[in-house]
Amino acid sequence: MNFVTFNQDHSHLGVGTSNGYRVYTTDPFNKQSESREGDVSSLEMLFSTSLVALTLSPRVLRIQNTKGKRHSTICEMTFRTAILAMRLNRKRLVVVLESELYIYDISNMQMLRTEKTSPNPNAICALSASSENNYLIYPLPTKAAPATFQPPSHAPPKSDHIAPTSGEILIYDATKMEAVNVIEAHNSPLSCIALNNDGTLLATASEKGTIIRVFSIPDAQKLYQFRRGSIPARIFSMSFNSTSTLLSVSSATETVHIFRLGAPNTSRSNSISSGPTTLLSTSHQRSSSRTSEDISDEFGSSTADMAASERKPLNPTFASMIRRTSQTVGKSFAATVGGYLPSAVAEIWEPSRDFAWVKVPRSPNAASAGPVRTVVALSNNGPQIMVVTSEGNYYVFNVDLEKGGEGTLYKQYS
């Protein structure tokens, strides 16, 4: 299995293999279409239509109509470098290369724009499923410093951009074809981003993977901050449910976290570390955002480390006392105390843990093969979470939305 993905409304699941691809419905789980031709490294579906975009070789993209037994090719394009990802909605096709984005009008496959990016080997990019809020999100390009010497004529051309050193995000209007805002989401480079169905919320995670943040789009206000854990782990996948009340997050830890999105305290979020409301932010906003993440991450890590090393329950450390207190403190008390603390420190007191989670089973032979990659989606038909693993397993877990806690395995397919 080369690749796996859900479509925009999580009703279909696409799998790319070295011998073609398969498309399944998720509820009930049935194979809808397949092709046994080509080495498919990635694919994207357009909702529940018969249109599928395929990457058949590192540089070749094919748009196919899967209706009927004979799949017809609508168009085929070859790019200068390897295709790392594709994004689709009813208006746009975005092709992600390592240092470029190609944006097409999906109605006639006319290329509208090419955007230069910083090196983006992990294809960090999200396109809204909504045609009205048609936003494209990717890491803010960072210009390289001017060369101090003239390279020899035979040397290959150097990129105008360098790899990002922080988690700044560009919000791009894919209808008007213009940048509209910038979010300073994290101090570390990004590892994963996800948009909700309406194109109004953006979830972000950095390479540390300890803090998940949710911003409003396009005004870039920080609405929620969640803590996945204290130990850094790479975030593989994030997904909102259809009503944007839940956010699921999978990582290299084999635990899938589910966070509840209640009514955000926007006035406080805005005053603490909201993103800039214009394309250029002030130096004060930059400093505040980065300082808050540093303190929040360091607080969580030091607390976990001290609690783990302290083995004398009759003489608890100050850190372990704070840890227990923070788990039981009420929301009203946290909000009151937060009002008197500096903005960077106030975020520590916010109750931001997951309310539910599931444990992804591992096969016995996978223990020495490193972390199992997972892709997650929340079902539109009930309180369930769907998880697909790089081992080729598809799991459906039931989640208790009232009590939370650990979800139970409901179905499993291989």
UniProtKB/Swiss-Prot annotation:
Residues 267-310 are annotated as: Disordered. It comes from the Eukaryota. A motif (L/FRRG motif) lies at residues 226-230. SUPFAM superfamilies: WD40 repeat-like. The keyword Isomerase does not apply. WD repeats lie at residues 1-34, 69-114, 139-182, 185-225, 230-269, 317-359, 367-407. InterPro entries: PROPPIN, WD40/YVTN_repeat-like_dom_sf, WD40_repeat_dom_sf, WD40_rpt. The keyword Cell cycle does not apply. It is a peripheral membrane protein. It is found in: Preautophagosomal structure membrane; Vacuole membrane; Endosome membrane. Keywords: Autophagy, Endosome, Membrane, Protein transport, Repeat, Transport, Vacuole, WD repeat. Residues 267-276 have a biased composition (Polar residues). This is Autophagy-related protein 18. It comes from Phaeosphaeria nodorum (strain SN15 / ATCC MYA-4574 / FGSC 10173) (Glume blotch fungus).
